[in-house]
Swiss-Prot record:
Protein name: E3 ubiquitin-protein ligase ZNRF1
Chain segments carrying region Disordered: 1-36, 61-84
Metabolic or biological pathway, per its Swiss-Prot or TrEMBL entry: Protein modification; protein ubiquitination
Organismal lineage: Eukaryota, Metazoa, Chordata, Craniata, Vertebrata
Polar residues bias spans: 1-10
An annotated Gene Ontology molecular function: ubiquitin-protein transferase activity
The keyword Translocase is annotated on this UniProt entry: no
Pfam short name (any one): zf-RING_2
Gene3D superfamilies per UniProt: Zinc/RING finger domain, C3HC4 (zinc finger) (3.30.40.10)
EC top class named in words: transferase
An annotated GO cellular component: endosome
Zinc finger (RING-type): 152-193
Function of the protein: E3 ubiquitin-protein ligase that plays a role in neuron cells differentiation. Plays a role in the establishment and maintenance of neuronal transmission and plasticity.
């Protein structure tokens, strides 16, 4: 019983031909953004400290870098370096890519409407903004609650007799102060956002 015994004939590396021993591949002097990390293996520093790599240009997918002129290596050891080509892989580690990803995704994910808080594609931004501004704000009747009526879904507190409430056209009721706060950000009923 118990776990499977490992055999000496089988490679312990996760992939055939790939060593899991960190000392098997010494860091190259050309890749200045890698440094030895003891038991953790090779670690990556911030992209801003990488010599020879310029920050990604706007519009470039994350993880792609331009190689600037590298005088430390005595000019160009390869034609790729002298042309300023894009690099992905050994020059752009996974850690570097993960640091850049949120900035790139945020720049390309669209626009957040300040009226309805929806995310809108850049090409639809103007039309959406006009539509949001021209959409009428919901009006409501304020009243004093005559009997207990359940829970306010905004603050999650009970609607008790004597509370000042707001009754929307869809007949939903909320604390008046809660719905006023809600309408500062949204223009719809919290329970019926598509109306």
């Amino acid at each position: 019983m118990g776990g499977k015994q490992s055999s000496a004939s089988r490679s312990r590396a996760p992939f055939p031909g790939v060593s899991s021993d960190d000392s098997a591949v010494p860091p190259s002097s050309n890749f200045g953004h890698f440094r030895a990390g003891g038991a953790m293996g090779l670690r990556s520093r911030s992209v801003s400290s990488v010599s020879g790599l310029d920050p990604p240009a706007p519009g470039l997918p994350f993880g792609l870098y331009r190689a600037g002129p590298d005088t430390e290596r005595g000019g160009s050891s390869g034609s790729e370096d002298s042309r300023g080509d894009l690099y992905l892989g050994s020059r752009a580690s996974l850690a570097d890519t993960l640091q850049i990803a949120p900035r790139w995704i945020g720049a390309h994910s669209g626009f957040r409407c300040p009226i309805c808080s929806k995310s809108v594609a850049p090409d639809e931004m103007e039309m959406h903004f006009i539509m949001c501004l021209s959409k009428p704000r919901l009006s409501y009747n304020d009243d004093v609650l005559t009997r207990d009526a359940g829970e306010c879904v905004i603050c999650l507190e009970e609607l008790s007799q004597g509370d000042t409430i707001a009754r929307l056209p869809c007949l939903c009721i909320y604390h008046k102060s809660c719905i006023d706060s809600w309408f500062e950000v949204n223009r719809c009923c919290p329970e019926h956002p598509s109306d």
